[in-house]
Curated annotation (Swiss-Prot):
The gene is rplA. Coiled coil: none annotated. GO terms for molecular function: rRNA binding; structural constituent of ribosome; tRNA binding. This is Large ribosomal subunit protein uL1. The keyword Manganese does not apply. Part of the 50S ribosomal subunit. The keyword Nucleotidyltransferase does not apply. Binds directly to 23S rRNA. The L1 stalk is quite mobile in the ribosome, and is involved in E site tRNA release. GO terms for cellular component: large ribosomal subunit. SUPFAM superfamilies: Ribosomal protein L1.
């Protein structure tokens, strides 16, 4: 614990908490100040001036990062017949129907993404209390309720991320790993930032983005100046 505290202090000394860095500087600092013993994730966090209690100010969606996330996603698909075969051919890790519902209700959660064809949502709905709190419930807005299961599986395996504003208007997302080249992290950040800019609700008032920062799994938060690119 003492060693970790010392590492954190050293990391904090490298970052000026009063300064907003360019995205290139922020990414470089994030890599330099990471002290995790594993290949930590690089994350972005947005504080948005929105009121998610209003239906037209809720922000939720999905996108495919140009350079992926560096994480191998375990994909589960609820489908039957030809669609189940399509999912398997596309590389889904688990495909099924009621058998998977029973398994999940029994405590099994060894998957990262859940996809379902529309006709399967009646049985998937039984898992609301399990999948909902973990942000795993399939949703048309994130492209996880679809008849094109092959595309959904391929995107999930190829760097697709989902995002959603919480009650306080905060949005967090993984944009890669510390091991990524800095330019790839910058490209991923810019792609996600463009999505966040376009997601601004028409009814939002005042400054939309009140804070943008980059951090690693065990690193320090580094403020980013959105006007730097």
């Amino acid at each position: 614990m003492a060693k970790k505290s010392k590492q954190m202090r050293a990391a904090l000394e490298k970052v000026d908490s009063t300064k907003a860095y360019s995205v290139e500087e922020a990414v470089t600092l994030a890599k330099e100040t990471n002290f995790a013993k594993f290949d930590a994730s690089v994350e972005v966090a947005y504080n948005l001036n929105i009121d998610v209690r209003k239906a037209d100010q809720q922000i939720r969606g999905a996108m495919v990062l140009p350079n992926g996330t560096g994480k191998t996603q375990r994909v589960l698909v609820f489908a039957r017949g030809a669609k189940a075969e399509e999912a398997k051919a596309a590389g889904a890790d688990f495909v099924g129907e009621d058998d998977l519902v029973a398994k999940i209700n029994g405590g099994w959660l060894d998957f990262d993404v859940v996809i379902a064809t529309p006709d399967m949502m009646a049985i998937v709905g039984r898992l609301g209390r399990v999948l909902g709190p973990r942000n795993l419930m399939p949703n048309p807005k994130t492209g996880t309720v679809t008849m094109d299961v092959a595309k959904a599986v391929e995107e999930s395996k190829g760097g697709k991320i989902t995002y959603r504003a919480d009650k306080a208007g905060n949005v967090q997302a993984i944009i890669g790993k510390v091991s990524f080249d800095a330019d790839k992290l910058v490209e991923n950040f810019k792609a996600f930032h463009e999505v966040m800019v376009k997601a601004k609700p028409a009814t939002a008032k005042g400054t939309y983005m009140t804070n943008v920062s980059i951090t690693t799994t065990q690193g320090v938060g580094i403020k980013v100046d959105p006007s730097s690119f």
